[in-house]
Amino acid sequence: MRVEREPGEPGLAVSFSHHRDDSRMVRHVVRPWIRAGGSLADDVTLAASELVANVVEHTDDGGRVRLWDQDPLLLEVDDHEHGLPRLREHPDESGGRGLAIVGRLAESWGVRVTPSGKTVWATFRRPPA
């Protein structure tokens, strides 16, 4: 995994390989980066972890997590597959709940197809000061 600052942006970028421990490693980088604690840090960290787990489970390559420190906070996870993710139709299906979890935690979320694959993004509103 490689951690880098986005040039000219107040964000964090974490590149990850295709390894089952990537979700755990991303959690250890994302959580301390978020300046607010409490539920915002918990929600963003869990969402990033779930999206990275999806990349590891459903693709043959790694990807990148990016965060922008703004309001709302923006999380993006890029991968190199063009296939769109899908929400599970039946809640009793085993596994596959990552997008549903992100949908519950985030203010909004979506998918953007890119020339090199796709980006799943989510926004998180900061709690009032």
Language model features by range: what are they?
Residues S23-S49:
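Conserved short strand/loop->alpha-helix "switch" segment adjacent to the catalytic nucleotide/phosphoryl-transfer site
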Residues V30-G37, N54-T59, L67:
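Alpha-helix C-terminal capping segments
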Residues F16, I34-G37, D92:
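Active-site oxyanion-binding pockets that recognize sulfate/phosphate
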Residues H19-D22, L40-V44, T59, S94, ...:
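Generic hydrophobic secondary-structure packing signal
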Residues L46-V55, G63:
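Long, contiguous hydrophobic alpha-helical segments, chiefly transmembrane helices and signal peptides
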Residues M1-A13, V56-A129:
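Conserved beta-strand-loop-beta-strand hairpin that lines the nucleotide-binding pocket
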Residues A13-M25:
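STAS-typified acidic loop motif
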